[in-house]
Amino acid sequence: MIVESWALKVQPPAVPLLDVRNLTTRFHTRAGIVHAVESVSFSVEPGQTIGIVGESGSGKSVSCYSLLGLVPQPPGKIHSGQALFDGIDLLQASEKTLRTIRGKRISMIFQDPMTSLNPYLKISKQLTEPLEVHEGMKGPEALQRAIESLEEVGIPDAAQRIHSYPHEFSGGMRQRVMIAMALITRPELLIADEPSTALDVTVQKQVLDLLRERQKALGLSIILITHDLAVVSENCEMVNVMYAGRIVEKASANELFSNPLHAYTRALLKSIPATHQRGDELYTIPGIPPDLSQQPDHCSFSTRNTIGDSSRCLTDHRPELTEISDGHYAQNCPGCLA
């Protein structure tokens, strides 16, 4: 009886909504092969928000575009990996299968709402199109659902504004329209690619607060792609730090910010203006990221490593992501961990 009661209390491990393993995406160009994403693995649990953070060109967006079949082929090609979404391998799925998932069960918010919205179509048409494609909903019923979606994201006078064109909205309001469009089909997973980059700080906070509010209301999971660690600290439970197409560190947000291990993560944190005293010179990471057309056989951060000990960085082989402590992973380069 004791054994039975103990067994009832044991909970099975949570099954990830999305489980990505060893994703590798490359671009075949005239100048050579660009190793944009190499052996990237991460998972997202139901209702969880994870962050993918790094500089421009680190592979953040390409990783997520690969999952939805949005990488143009050619020149792009997914060379290997697996991405299980509710038992479906997105990387092996047909375009027909992806169309039933993309925009319905997995939605995406892109960086620039002005270029993501069609300037020639009214908001009403752009909001109702996903309903028509994925749910067969048309006419007054679809229009009413679209109006409600605008009201849910805080757009005033939604019944009139829905007949406006994108240029008639401010930047912040356009981003709210993008959020409404992404969530109108009630997806299970939302990929938000730099959703607040082009907005001022006040509007940025409003948009991020809105995402949290809608996440709570709908119970969805979120992948937040950003270069801003301050945004990650306030919104994510797990964080993946990417550099030169690879994950260099991953941990819970609390662990990463209290005990960053990799020199690149520490450099990103040191670059946050709020960590400096008034009058101090702002820290910047020296140099530029490596040329991804060259597959490195050494530590790719060694030439920019001023936080750790660059003299100890690996020169004869590439570092691998290793579990340093419970649930905290980092590339095992001695110089970057110094």
Tell me what each language-model feature is.
Residues A14-P16, I33, P156-Q160, K250-A338:
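Short catalytic/signature loops enriched in Gly
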Residues E55, I191, P195, L199-D280:
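P-loop NTP-binding/switch modules centered on Walker-like glycine-rich loops
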Residues I78-D89:
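Conserved ABC transporter NBD signature motif
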Residues I88-D89, E141-Q160, L269-K270:
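Conserved ABC ATPase "signature" region
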Residues S164-F169, M173:
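Conserved ABC ATPase signature
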Residues I184-E188:
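A short, proline-enriched helix->beta-strand linker immediately N-terminal to the Walker B motif
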